[in-house]
């Protein structure tokens, strides 16, 4: 993988290449991603999803509050921006041509990580992982089984193992209301967002949590592969059939979430 590809400013529907040197320095291309996410309906809906309900120290205290997914996402994005800028400085020192030839600065790295971190929970259903399991059970051994015959094995597996990360990719990229490509985020930001760049099948027999998760639904596979190709993500040697190695900045998004 190379950073020129990994930092792609391309957006769905683009007909010409976006160059970093041509970007407006007062509002970086990757900062536009952050703005589009924070003003989106799916992000605003996170205010109704609980991240943590703290035990009250004092029942009558005005300082008691519910920590929502929206608040959590804002906090993670702030940490992610700092991590991205710090790591970005080191990357530019090792690869100075990214700045001298292409015009990238350490702020670009911070902006990518901040935007991806802001969206990291955007696809989570109500009740988080419990909600994912409830949806999965509905299709695995509930009334949802009636739809199995109308789907491919992979399509049905997407529902049996319903995954918030895949749903997030769908929300960010799905064409609706006449808007092609959803939020039309840069491919660099989408790459950093994709924690699990693989499909729901084949399933790898493993106890490792990452092997049980996936990053896209079958309905979004063609665009997922377009992003992968643009970024130059490499096939995962441990899952050659349907998986790719992560975008390096994804690790910073995950670190910010810990």
What is each of the regions a protein language model found here?
Residues 50-64:
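A short small-residue
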Residues 63-66, 246:
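Active-site oxyanion-binding pockets that recognize sulfate/phosphate
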Residues 1-26, 34, 38-49, 74, ...:
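Sequence-structural signature of the catalytic-core scaffold of metal-dependent phosphohydrolases
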């Amino acid at each position: 993988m190379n950073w020129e590809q990994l930092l792609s400013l391309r957006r769905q529907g683009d007909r010409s290449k976006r160059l970093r040197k041509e970007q407006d320095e007062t509002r970086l291309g990757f900062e536009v991603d952050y703005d589009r996410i924070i003003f989106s309906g799916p992000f605003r809906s996170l205010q109704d999803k609980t991240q943590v309900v703290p035990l009250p120290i004092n029942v009558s205290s005005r300082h008691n509050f519910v920590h929502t997914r929206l608040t959590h996402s804002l906090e993670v994005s702030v940490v992610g921006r700092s991590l991205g800028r710090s790591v970005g400085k080191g990357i530019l020192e090792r690869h100075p041509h990214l700045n001298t030839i292409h015009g990238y600065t350490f702020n670009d790295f911070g902006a990518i990580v901040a935007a991806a971190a802001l969206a990291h929970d955007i696809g989570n259903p109500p009740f988080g992982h419990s909600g994912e399991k409830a949806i999965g059970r509905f299709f695995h051994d509930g009334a949802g089984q009636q739809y199995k015959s109308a789907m491919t094995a992979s399509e049905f597996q997407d529902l049996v193992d319903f995954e918030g990360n895949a749903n997030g990719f769908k929300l960010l990229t799905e064409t609706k209301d006449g808007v092609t490509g959803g939020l039309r985020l840069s491919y660099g930001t989408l790459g950093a967002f994709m924690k699990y760049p693989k499909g729901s099948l084949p399933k790898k027999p493993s106890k490792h949590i990452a092997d049980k998760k996936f990053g896209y639904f079958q309905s979004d596979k063609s665009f997922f592969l377009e992003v992968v190709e643009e970024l130059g993500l490499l096939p995962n040697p441990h899952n050659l059939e349907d998986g790719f190695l992560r975008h390096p900045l994804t690790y910073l998004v995950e670190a910010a979430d810990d």
